[in-house]
Amino acid sequence: MIGVFVIALVLVTPSAAWMRKLDRIAGALQELRDAGVVVLFSPMQEMNGVWFWWGIDSHRTDPEPYIRVYRAMHDFFNKEKGLDNLIWVYSPTSTYGNETVTNYVFRAVDWAYPGDNYVDIIAGTNYADDMSISDYPTYIKMGKPLGNAGFGPSSDGPFLKNGTWDLSRIIERIKKDYPRIAFWESWHSYPGSSWSMISNLNADILLADPFVINRDDLPWNIK
């Protein structure tokens, strides 16, 4: 019930605590702006799942509360704080083919989309042993540049525990089936799990592929 309370009331009379949080975030982002750093910013991601307070448990039949909070945050950072170094990333969780309104865990990836004027890039998260992105056709229809904001082996598959997920297959899958994916972000490992690239097989092969641009290949001009 905490989630229901927070998402429903956060914008009714914006609380001092909420605004202090946004101010602190804005302060850090301003430092990056002043240093010439552009930020891929994906606030309140995986909103179409149940595990965060801003997720569907707080508004099961209506995405409007999430959309209002996202838009208000966007306007606060962009207009009031002048943070023109932010690239806004809409980052839902993959539905893994379970995007029905009656499903307890997921809503469709575009269910809480805040609108084209509030999103620059769409980059969902996706954890699948076969490296499939079931929502890719929907992402294409949404008409924005695409990325993958979190990937790794399935949470209930064999690779998560033993670190034998073959990363060399990722780039081949992207080339063949998901060519609009422009970047990806690996999740980290923690005790008992092997999510990260370095914890699995053939990360060096993946990063050495000519299709991949690494950090050292980029023309950094930050002063």
Name the predicted role of every residue range.
Residues 42-44, 70-107, 146-154, 186:
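Aromatic-lined carbohydrate-recognition surfaces of secreted/lumenal glycan-active proteins
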Residues 24-28, 92-113, 128-139, 164-173:
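Alpha-helical scaffolding within the catalytic cores
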Residues 147-223:
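Substrate-binding cleft of secreted/luminal carbohydrate-active enzymes
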Residues 8-19, 59-63, 120-128, 152-160:
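The substrate-binding groove and active-site-proximal loops of carbohydrate-active enzymes
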